[in-house]
């Protein structure tokens, strides 16, 4: 089994332009064989726009990681070329994201804004949440009780268990104090862990 798990960080829900795209390619023989984190040069370079981003408080983290070489700031077209090259080279059995509808939309929106026509995810990204964790983890009695016990409930008039990646990871790893970083590569790592656990619970393959 070989999978590609990706995550995007965007300016916001109302402006889902990608400034950070990270992904991991994993197989069940060698583990993680590719890990990449790219900052979109055309977006990140717009200082005023970045200051209004939903996770603008993460900017110092990005500055440090760029300085350390942990991530690279490159043009959007280059990011997608590398992603396509990795897909062609490693031939993953599936491309996944947690709440993939958001990532699909954000990548398409960024392509449209920046005039990039070749989108490696245009055929769709498989959803870890709706496809696997929702039926097999977050609707189980054990998960519901876990969320109730620790206060991981939504703020709806009738609260229900949170289904976001952070809470699912807390449950699976029994780490109630875990806080999602909300940077693309690091979030891809926890999404991979969730995917692998969900696949093991269902006996399914990617």
Protein language model annotation of sequence segments:
Residues 65-70, 114-120, 175-180:
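Short, polar/flexible loop-turn hinges at active-site or ligand-entry regions and domain interfaces
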Residues 102-126:
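Substrate-recognition/cap helix-loop segment adjacent to the acidic, metal-dependent catalytic center
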Residues 91-101, 105-106, 110-111, 151-206:
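Acidic, Mg2+-coordinating catalytic module of metal-dependent nucleases/exonucleases
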Residues 13-15, 133, 193:
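Conserved protein kinase catalytic core
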Residues 44-62, 130-186:
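Active-site-proximal helix-loop-helix substrate-binding element of RNase H-like nuclease domains
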Residues 2-110:
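Conserved non-catalytic scaffold segment of RNase H-like nuclease domains
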């Amino acid at each position: 089994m070989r999978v590609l798990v990706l995550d995007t960080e965007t300016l916001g829900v109302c402006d889902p332009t990608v400034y950070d795209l990270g992904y991991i390619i994993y197989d069940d023989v060698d583990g993680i064989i590719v890990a990449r984190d790219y900052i979109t040069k055309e977006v990140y370079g717009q200082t005023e726009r970045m200051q209004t981003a939903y996770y603008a408080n993460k900017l110092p983290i990005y500055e440090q990681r760029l300085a350390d070489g942990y991530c690279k700031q490159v043009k959007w077209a280059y990011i997608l070329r590398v992603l396509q090259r990795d897909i062609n080279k490693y031939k993953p059995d599936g491309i996944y994201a947690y709440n993939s509808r958001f990532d699909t939309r954000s990548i398409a929106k960024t392509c449209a804004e920046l005039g990039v026509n070749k989108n490696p995810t245009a055929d769709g990204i498989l959803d870890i949440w709706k496809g696997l964790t929702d039926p097999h983890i977050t609707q189980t009695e054990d998960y519901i009780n876990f969320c109730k016990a620790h206060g991981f409930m939504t703020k709806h008039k009738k609260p229900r268990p949170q289904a976001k990646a952070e809470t699912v990871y807390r449950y699976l790893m029994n780490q109630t104090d875990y806080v999602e970083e909300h940077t693309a590569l690091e979030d891809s790592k926890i999404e991979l862990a969730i995917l692998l656990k969900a696949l093991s619970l269902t006996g399914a393959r990617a």
